[in-house]
């Protein structure tokens, strides 16, 4: 039953995010915040598919243990695409609120992203095995969490200062995604049920994408 529920949920998630992303790309002008947001959604869905598709196959066939290599490779790819996702979200923030300058913030975003990706590439992660070291799981997620925190602060301040009702909860979607993700990193190997927190974490990302999509529909409608 768990395999069926999780597989159906993952398919729904991937189809939703990719469909919304493609619609945003097709329905927006080049160089706009919504074109960037659509690209961000496609990166999210495409990256997650490398992990979720093998996971669905594993759950519905011989089990996770038998799919160590494709699952590990999928997690590896997803760890990089999620970093790219937040870099794109940073540029959505810059475009939406017409931010100029802020070179120090941009440098911080790139520095944290670079450190995160370099750490993800280290062989000590043992991605292609069934047992990745907890210490490296924590280490590679420290710059990722700091990047997320930076994006949270930026959207919270800007949405409040600009009375941006469409994006007023963007910061919260990121808080929730990390709030559900961190316990999985720390304790999923000890208690596999904690891995179920990836479902509400995924829902938080769907909320993130829908915020952008709904804003595009509303703001495009006003222009027309």
What kind of feature is each model-predicted range?
Residues 39-53, 74-91, 103-124, 139-151, ...:
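Alpha-helical transmembrane segments of multi-pass integral membrane proteins
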Residues 1-19:
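Hydrophobic transmembrane alpha-helical segments in integral membrane proteins
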Residues 171-217:
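Terminal transmembrane helical module of multi-pass membrane proteins
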Residues 3-6, 64-76, 129-142, 191-201:
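Non-cytosolic membrane-interface motifs at loop->transmembrane helix junctions
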Residues 17-26, 87-93, 118-123, 142-168, ...:
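Alpha-helical transmembrane segments in multipass membrane proteins, preferentially the mid-helix core
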Residues 26-37, 93-105, 130-133, 156-168, ...:
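Membrane-interface helix-boundary motifs at transmembrane edges
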């Amino acid at each position: 039953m768990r395999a069926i529920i999780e597989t159906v949920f993952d398919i729904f998630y991937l189809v939703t995010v990719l469909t919304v992303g493609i619609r945003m790309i097709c329905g927006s002008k080049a160089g706009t915040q919504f074109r960037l947001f659509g690209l961000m959604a496609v990166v999210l869905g495409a990256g997650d598919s490398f992990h979720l598709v093998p996971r669905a196959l594993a759950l519905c066939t011989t089990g996770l243990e038998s799919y160590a290599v494709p699952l590990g490779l999928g997690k590896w790819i997803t760890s990089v695409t999620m970093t790219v996702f937040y870099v794109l979200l940073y540029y959505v923030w810059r475009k939406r609120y017409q931010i100029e300058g802020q070179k120090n913030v941009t440098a911080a975003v790139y520095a944290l992203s670079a450190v995160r990706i370099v750490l993800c590439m280290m062989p000590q992660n043992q991605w292609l095995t069934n047992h990745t070291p907890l210490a490296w799981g924590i280490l590679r997620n420290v710059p990722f969490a700091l990047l997320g925190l930076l994006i949270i602060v930026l959207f919270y301040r800007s949405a409040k200062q600009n009375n941006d009702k469409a994006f007023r909860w963007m910061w919260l979607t990121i808080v929730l995604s990390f709030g559900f993700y961190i316990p999985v990193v720390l304790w999923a190997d000890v208690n596999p049920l904690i891995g179920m927190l990836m479902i509400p974490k995924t829902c938080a990302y769907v909320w993130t994408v829908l915020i952008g999509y709904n804003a595009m529909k509303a703001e495009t409608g006003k222009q027309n």
